[in-house]
Amino acid sequence: MKNLRKWIVRLMPVIALIIVAGLILSRVYRPESTPAEPDLRITVHEAAEHIGERAVVCGIVESADFVPSVGGEPTFLNFGRPHPDQVFTVVIWGEDRARWPAPPEERYLTQRICVTGTIQSHQGVPQIRARVPQQIKAQQI
């Protein structure tokens, strides 16, 4: 009985330290949360009016190209009309491309898709950078 009390007395500070460390770490570490889908849902033809805004942009992929010879190894999904006359583009940079289970230029070509993200302008063409496949949802035509 006396030995048990000694062990309990010795273990109490260790248990208290573990509890305190757990509480501190629960405040420091927060799993990455997925932002809620934006309220703004538009077509590719409306995207130019919403530069800088977070939106869901929907349309049909008219052309799709993986260009490994360009710096950053981009994949371009072009909407409205084929490149170079596209009205909207989704760009997937090489560093993000490995996250897709199949080549995006093959998977999405001629598909109606919706992409979620912040609309930027690149050389006058609105675009969204897709970093993860979850940003792109295939739609039924």
Please tell me what each predicted stretch does.
Residues 4-141:
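OB-fold and OB-like single-stranded nucleic-acid-recognition modules
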